[in-house]
Amino acid sequence: QIGNHIFDMVDAVAAKEQKKALDYYYDLLTLKEPPMRILYLLTRQFRILMEVKEMDRTGVPPKEIAAKVGIMPFLVGKYRTQAKAFTRKELRGIVEAGVQTEEDVKTGKMGDILSVELFLVQYSSKREK
């Protein structure tokens, strides 16, 4: 269940559907999922997208992509689709922001619930043209 919510949350971020991304987050909080676990899973998901995008760009076959990133082969297509919504630079920035957000919480600079909220708001906002 949490995996589906995380995947859906990333879809919402990719589509710049901020309300939907936050709704999934609040659903997970209601289900008593710790904010830091949610952040970890989101960051992991974006890291996988970054790896899939890079391997896809260099022509790595789907089965090999699945083996290298640790996902089921039938999921490669879904990850490719999600990855297309982002540039490599955006994915790298999101992963770095996830790591920084986790550090900010662990060092007491930010509260856990708010920090994940801000992370989602930042990356699900409409892009400036």
What is each PLM-predicted segment?
Residues 39, 43-46, 95, 99, ...:
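Generic structural concept
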